[in-house]
A protein has these predicted regions:
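Structured soluble/peripheral alpha/beta segments that form catalytic or ligand/cofactor-binding pockets
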Residues: 2-356
Length: 356
């Protein structure tokens, strides 16, 4: 109802860090999102997701901006985090919601420091490390993430189209190949863990169109140091929206944009959620034309990685650890790991859709 008062992602943006790691309250929705795959010294494997969303509920106006009451409800913060225990085929998820306020939740605007109760993600300018703390009833994580190269701007200088109309877009950057180490507490045990993580930041206002059902999003790390971010915006008729795109990232941090015509995604067998009834494709084939012709097979490491979000009033989605096998035209094999997110299989994402 307040959508017209919020800023929209309309033009390419001149990103400035660390400022753009921080909050952008002039946009309605944004998120700080981290996924990764970790292993213990004994090679026990885990996947993790950690996301804090900020959702504006009051329009951005000069009158509102002058109010200094710290208890004024302007933003809601939502936490979604999960641990995929690959060895035991267990998925442990947690969610929480809070208004912004002292001791509850919030986000700084000048750098990455975002928190919801005991859960926090920060960027330390001195050490150049991202620090992440997750505290849930089932597990706790305390991680340090070290960047390999600067953030990668997706789309057109960070303007990432999600539909054909002006404003159906987000500002979006990725930070792949974050060398990760830290501590996992699970079932009264503590494990030293290490691995690779991926950070995504997006901010926007109602970026989806009414004809769109959801998206399929991939963040993949390959064993040779390359990486891939790719999303398919899915129409309600099942077709791939022309705004679908991706970014191929080379080991030195240079990147190449992939348009809708540069790839084909083919869903494979599905897993039926006993909780929501949704059918999620848990195996995919991906055919790429760029940066070189190749075919990827992407498979879930655990079938049930559905985030049931009834407690935080968002649509259910599947978010989980995957393995990747790549075969190029020379029949050379390359392996990788990453994360897959699938939305809109249970219900469409009305909160992110543009209302005219």
């Amino acid at each position: 109802e307040y959508a017209s008062a919020w800023e929209k992602a309309l033009e390419p943006r001149n990103f400035s860090f660390p400022r753009d790691h921080g909050s952008h309250p002039q946009f309605k929705t944004e998120w700080w999102y981290v996924t990764g795959q970790l292993s213990t010294e004994k090679e026990r494997s885990f996947g993790f997701q950690f996301t804090i969303f900020r959702h504006g509920i009051k329009e951005n106006s000069p009158e509102k901006a002058t109010l200094k009451n710290p208890w004024q409800v302007r933003d809601l913060f939502i936490l979604h985090c999960a641990l995929s225990d690959i060895e035991n085929q267990r998925f442990l998820s947690h969610q929480d919601i809070s208004r912004a306020g002292p001791g509850l939740a919030g986000a700084l605007e000048n750098n990455m420091e975002t928190w919801l109760k005991g859960n926090r993600i920060t960027f330390n300018e001195k050490t150049q490390l991202i620090e992440l703390t997750a505290k849930t009833p089932d597990y706790e994580l305390a991680l340090e993430l070290k960047p390999t190269y600067p953030p990668i701007l997706n789309g057109n200088r960070g303007l990432s189209a999600k539909g054909s109309k002006p404003g159906q877009a987000s500002y979006y950057y990725s930070w792949p190949r974050l060398t990760t180490k830290g501590l996992l507490k699970l079932s009264e045990e503590s494990f030293a863990v290490k691995g690779l993580s991926w950070l995504d930041r997006e901010f926007a206002t109602n970026q989806l169109g009414p004809e769109q059902a959801g998206w399929d999003w991939f963040a993949l790390h390959f064993d040779d140091g390359q990486a891939l971010m790719l999303y398919r915006m899915r129409l309600k008729n099942g077709a791939q929206d022309r705004s679908s795109s991706g970014t191929w990232i080379f080991p030195d941090g240079s990147s190449q944009h992939l348009s809708n015509q540069d790839f084909e995604l083919i869903p494979g067998p599905t897993w039926n959620s006993p909780e929501s009834g949704a059918d999620y494709p848990v195996n995919w084939k991906l055919k790429l034309k760029k940066p070189a012709p190749m075919q990827l097979t992407i498979s879930a490491l655990l079938l049930n990685q559905e985030m049931n979000t009834a407690n935080t009033a968002l649509a259910n989605y599947w978010e989980g650890a995957v393995k990747v096998e790549v075969l190029d035209d020379a029949k050379r094999k390359l392996n990788g790991r990453g994360y897959l997110e699938m939305t809109g299989y249970d219900q469409t994402l009305k909160a992110l859709q543009k209302r005219d």
